[in-house]
Amino acid sequence: MPEGRRLRRALAIALLALVAVTGLLMMAKEQQMGQEISPFDGHSNLALAQAVARGDTQGIHAQATQDRLRERGDRQVTLLQWAVLSQQPDSVQALLDLGADPAAAGLDGNSALHTAAMLQDAQYLRLLLAEGAQMNVRNAVTGATPLAAAVLAGREEQLRLLLAAGADTTLSDRLGDTPLHLAAKINRRTWRCCCCRPGPMPGRATSRASRSSFTSRKRRRICRMTN
């Protein structure tokens, strides 16, 4: 696939993901204002989801069972993603304490880590990383990592947090693009420099990834050019 088409497709996927996140953010805000709107309407864990959206940790513990924690809402959104989208850090922590999996695939194939990497507020990603979440988890549809989600969403702080936690810049998605490649294509100066850190060279899992991989010398050159 030509480079331009691959980039347009990656950006289109990122845009659709951001639209979905924005829609659920609005839904979460409406529910906090007392309107009966939830992606968990009609699900057995609706009361638990409502407690999550309110930040009601006592209600979360009272309602939580393993089956309810695993049950997904509309568009496969997980409760942990719902807590992040509802911007309720106490709910995020309560769900983590109860064993919710940050790496579980949910909304549009993304994990809660992907969702947290796309939001403006970085505290939710910090909470997940503090629990030892798997930072290189793949989107179930695209194969993209949370680091790629942060690059495409333009979240510099999340990018730095993931890199500091050891996120791999060389893991390609199903189109063969790595977070490092995406950062260079989008021409984000700061993020290209962030990606130019010592680390393993891109693997040779596919010939496409191998052909397009950056060398360490190229990484250093990009850093010098963007300083």
Curated annotation (Swiss-Prot):
PROSITE patterns: ANK_REP_REGION (PS50297), ANK_REPEAT (PS50088). SUPFAM superfamilies: Ankyrin repeat. The keyword Signal applies. Keywords: ANK repeat, Repeat, Signal. It comes from the Bacteria. InterPro entries: Ankyrin_rpt (IPR002110), Ankyrin_rpt-contain_sf (IPR036770). Transmembrane segments: none annotated. It holds the Pfam family Ank_2. ANK repeats lie at residues 75-104, 108-137, 142-171, 175-204. Residues 1-35 form the signal peptide. Cell-protective protein that neutralizes the intracellular lysis capacity of phospholipase A1 through a direct interaction with the enzyme. This is Protein PhlB. It comes from Serratia liquefaciens. The lineage of its organism: Bacteria, Pseudomonadati, Pseudomonadota, Gammaproteobacteria, Enterobacterales.
